[in-house]
Amino acid sequence: MTARPDFEKFIVIVTYGRSGSTLLQTALQTIPGAMIRGENNNLLYPLFRAWKRAHNTRYNQGQTPIPAHGPWYGADEIVPRRFGEELAGLFVREILKPTSQTRVLGFKEIRFHDAEPGEMPEFLDFIREFFPPCRLVFNTRRAADVARSSWWKDVETEKVMEMVEDLDRQYADYVAAHSDTSFLVRYDDYVKDRASLRALFDFLGEAYDEAAIEAAFARRLPH
């Protein structure tokens, strides 16, 4: 088993397109030793699905020893926990690529809602389980402002707003159920008042550097 690169904390920004998440990502980069990567096209989702299939195979078809002539031969020897840890380690090493100076690792993703209906909470549980110690930061924005973005120009405004409002409810429900490892922020709040991010930094157990935050917000984003 290949050892996973070491880090103190793992932070994942959970959101949707044009929520201001790149600004939040930049703000979290002010944490000393932080490497918060950008999007990866929801690459972790198929890894979660692979782990889920392994888990279901082991505990549905492999509950008892299976002989060599059995159709599920070997299913009883699958170790879902170890498989999940290997997938997580591979994702960290080959996708996030932390350096020896990385103390806080993570990424942001705007495609969590690509999960099958009702599956996102289970996907998030997988992340918390296999990337410890993990903190999920849910980033929201006013639905009407998201829908006005040209990024959503090929989708009807009402559909975008419905999606955002539904995701906001799902985010709030998840945070309420996992308040020890999850936190909710609103772009509309911190873009007007940087200090509103202090609560997030307190939750993460990190110092809030006002000057560094101001510099991060002043930096022009590439999109």
Regions picked out by a protein language model, each given a short descriptive name:
Residues 1-93, 210-212, 216-223:
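PAPS-dependent sulfotransferase catalytic core
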Residues 55-59, 98-210:
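PAPS-dependent sulfotransferase catalytic domain
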